[in-house]
């Protein structure tokens, strides 16, 4: 069953069909993160995520939206500051994880994205931000979110990763962070395709372009294989289907990982199909008993229609009781019910943001 809908992102661009043919052999690995301080780092052991000392790590984090859309729209890389003071504000909320959305075209430097915001410049900005998060004791999750097949531009999140470019992105992302054992990588955010197609790839429900043409997708098994061949040995996060809201097929359709370092991800919002404790007990709990599970996106309502805390408190309290991590949507100053903050000094925005801040403080 599909979720009730998707969030309305702050800035979705219009689709542009380019005549330029694209040829990408892979992105440069310049600026790769050093692993000298993270020789072991985060690793999966059974259904727990552990740090280098063997202590359990449970994410209580936020999403930092902007890196998926600012670059493709041609006005920046981040939406808001990426400074030390802005990260310290996150740390003051006791955030220990930040999910960073990745734009495929911007990372690879393809499809006529402005050079100032793409390719080496984009990758360097992401790497520097990851280092800044590390210095503040925060674990980054890097998640491919906006992508597009062929010469289409990656102006929104489509139904599945594309066979044309996503494998090159996975290879480059994995190579860039292969020495950093304090990150987790997610090859995709939200999918609309069925569980078989999401695992194996192929032409299925995913479409793109003004005529909604089907395209060849790349599957999660290919993602894991590509990342491991690129020498990334850390955790890989695999989302569920139906906009990551349905994990009922996750255990039967998880990729094979020779390193046994897979985590599961669900996206849970108020008004989603799966947004009740009974659904969590039925579909999330069995997964959480087998592998580490995070709510990679979660909020009061998927459409930003409610600024309260009745839903998010239910979600996070259930997660706390089941050892499940979470990353709230979103650490941005959008001035609506999706926003956690009213400024990048960390002032909470509305009851939603205030509840999250208080809850994270209580977890200490």
Task: Tell me what each language-model feature is.
Residues 1-15:
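Bacterial N-terminal signal peptides that target proteins for export
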Residues 12-25:
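Bacterial N-terminal signal peptides
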Residues 19, 87, 130, 224, ...:
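Short glycine-/small-residue-rich flexible loop motifs, especially phosphate/cofactor-binding loops
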Residues 25-32, 235-237:
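Signal peptide processing junction and immediate N-terminal pro/mature segment
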Residues 31-97, 354-362:
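N-terminal carbohydrate-binding accessory modules
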Residues 41, 79, 96, 103, ...:
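Extracellular glycoside hydrolase catalytic/binding regions
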Residues 69-73, 84-177, 181-193:
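Substrate-binding cleft and catalytic face of glycoside hydrolase catalytic domains
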């Amino acid at each position: 069953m599909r979720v009730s809908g998707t969030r309305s992102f702050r800035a979705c661009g219009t689709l542009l069909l380019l005549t330029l043919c694209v040829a990408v052999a892979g992105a440069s690995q310049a600026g790769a993160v050093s692993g000298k301080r993270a020789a072991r780092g985060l690793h999966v052991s059974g259904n727990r995520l552990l740090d280098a000392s063997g202590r359990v790590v449970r994410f209580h984090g936020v999403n930092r939206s902007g890196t998926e859309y600012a670059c493709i729209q041609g006005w920046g890389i981040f939406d808001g500051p990426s400074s030390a003071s802005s990260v310290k504000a996150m740390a003051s909320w006791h955030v220990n994880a930040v999910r960073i959305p990745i734009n495929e075209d911007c990372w690879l430097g393809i499809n006529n994205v402005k050079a100032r915001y793409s390719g080496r410049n984009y990758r360097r900005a992401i790497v520097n931000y990851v280092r800044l998060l590390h210095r503040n004791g925060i674990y980054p999750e890097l998640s491919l979110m906006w992508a597009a097949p062929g010469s289409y531009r990656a102006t929104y999140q489509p139904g599945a990763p594309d066979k044309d470019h996503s494998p090159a992105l996975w290879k480059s992302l994995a190579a860039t962070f292969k020495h950093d054992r304090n990150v987790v990588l997610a090859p995709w955010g939200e999918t609309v395709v069925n569980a078989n197609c999401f695992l194996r790839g192929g032409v299925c429900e995913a479409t793109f372009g003004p005529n909604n043409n089907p395209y060849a997708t790349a599957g999660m098994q290919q993602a894991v294989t590509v990342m491991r061949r690129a020498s990334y040995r850390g955790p890989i996060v695999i989302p569920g289907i139906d906009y990551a809201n349905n994990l009922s097929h996750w255990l039967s359709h998880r990729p094979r990982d020779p390193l046994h370092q897979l985590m599961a991800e669900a996206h849970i919002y108020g008004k989603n199909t799966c947004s009740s404790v009974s659904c969590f007990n039925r579909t999330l709990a069995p997964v959480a008993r087998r592998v580490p599970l995070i709510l990679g996106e979660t909020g009061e309502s998927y459409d930003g229609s409610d600024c309260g805390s009745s839903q998010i408190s239910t979600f996070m309290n259930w997660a706390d009781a089941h050892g499940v991590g979470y990353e709230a949507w979103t650490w941005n100053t959008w001035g609506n019910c999706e926003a956690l903050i009213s400024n990048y000094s960390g002032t909470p925005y509305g009851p939603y943001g205030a509840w999250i801040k208080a809850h994270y403080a209580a977890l200490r």
